Amino acid sequence: MTPTPDAQAARELIRQAVSIPSLSGEEQAIAAFLRDWMARRGFDAQVDEAGNAVGVRGSGPLTVALLGHMDTVPGDIPVRVDEAGVLHGRGSVDAKGSLCTFIAAVSALPPEALSAARFVCIGATEEEAPSSKGARYAMRQHRPDFVLIGEPSGWAGLTLGYKGRLVAKVRVEKDNFHTAGDGTSAADDLTLGWQRVREWAAGFAPADSGGGGIFDRVQVTLQDLGSSGDGLTQRAWATIGLRLPPALAPYQAEEAIEQAFAGLGADLTFTGHESAVRHPKDNALTRALRVAIREQGGTPTFKVKTGTSDMNVVAELWPVPTLAYGPGDSALDHTPEERLDLAEYDRAVAVLTSALTRLVGG
């Protein structure tokens, strides 16, 4: 089936967006492109002080924030649309597909929706970096009544929450000694601490989790590990990544890591303090999306994700109905096979256009 002119314009938007390289910290070209695309279609568009591409349509009393991100991880995937109508390219799924869905849907809203609300599309910078620079700036500039986060959920999926995050950098140094003697090496001590961390994580079970799935458990991984010596001093180091459930705050995880390495002479530093978030599934926003998905022949599916997104970043300052939405399979994020079926993208745009209109009573 040949796409309508509006759908064809939406497809051209995502194809061009994916064609523009935009690593974290290098989003200037994509920001200018999105600003100009939105300005030509009636948005009040600008690139803000954080480098975000921001476009606003509508003049009503409600405010709906649609927060996506423009940056991608590294990886040069030749951009092409294959014979099956699938767009290949870095960012097609994570997460230019979602951001372009937001922009295309808002550009298609009817006058009655635009008189009921302001729709603020934000293409944020540095979501793929620990800074989340764009989201942290945007959350202090806007006070929305509803929030959509642009991350792939599949066109019929609605993501309610993401796990929290903490990164621990561990370093152990001690004087060198003869291995025939009685003692432990720096690597021994670091390994013992790591074993204690794993035991703590495996045993973590909040009373109200009912045994829960992976979303309610602590996940720990070694992201970096090494040791060295110069004949005088032994050194061992590691980076430990933690994914945190809603029942565990980052400061509580810090305390557990410190206890695990107690008495081992370890130097610990922590970064990436993000609390887990899980939003309710029955509110005006989720109801509007569920109805719109059914209109397109789908069955709405609620999800929670073990990763972390800008939903975690904005949750404290934006305590309003929130969910993440966008086309594509998140299993393809950051992979050499990243690709998005444009028919699914079309459907997501249609779903969101209908849902936003219903949400604001248009």
Swiss-Prot record:
Free-text function comment from the UniProt entry: Catalyzes the release of L-lysine from [LysW]-gamma-L-lysine.
Subcellular location: Cytoplasm
Keywords, in A-Z order: Amino-acid biosynthesis, Cobalt, Cytoplasm, Hydrolase, Lysine biosynthesis, Metal-binding, Zinc
Top-rank lineage group of the source organism: Bacteria
NCBIfam families linked to this entry: dapE-lys-deAc, PRK04443.1
One cellular component term from this protein's GO annotations in UniProt: cytoplasm
Name by which UniProt lists this protein: [LysW]-lysine hydrolase
GO annotation, biological process: lysine biosynthetic process via aminoadipic acid
Cofactor details (free text): Binds 2 Zn(2+) or Co(2+) ions per subunit.
Similarity section: Belongs to the peptidase M20A family. LysK subfamily.
Cofactors: Zn(2+); Co(2+)
Residues reported to bind Zn(2+) 1: 69, 94, 151
Pathway annotation: Amino-acid biosynthesis; L-lysine biosynthesis via AAA pathway; L-lysine from L-alpha-aminoadipate (Thermus route): step 5/5
This protein's encoding gene: lysK
Catalytic activity: [amino-group carrier protein]-C-terminal-gamma-(L-lysyl)-L-glutamate + H2O = [amino-group carrier protein]-C-terminal-L-glutamate + L-lysine
Residue numbers binding Zn(2+) 2: 94, 128, 334
Enzyme Commission number: 3.5.1.130
Enzyme class, broadest EC rank: hydrolase
GO molecular function, one term: zinc ion binding
Active-site residue numbers: 71, 127 (proton acceptor)
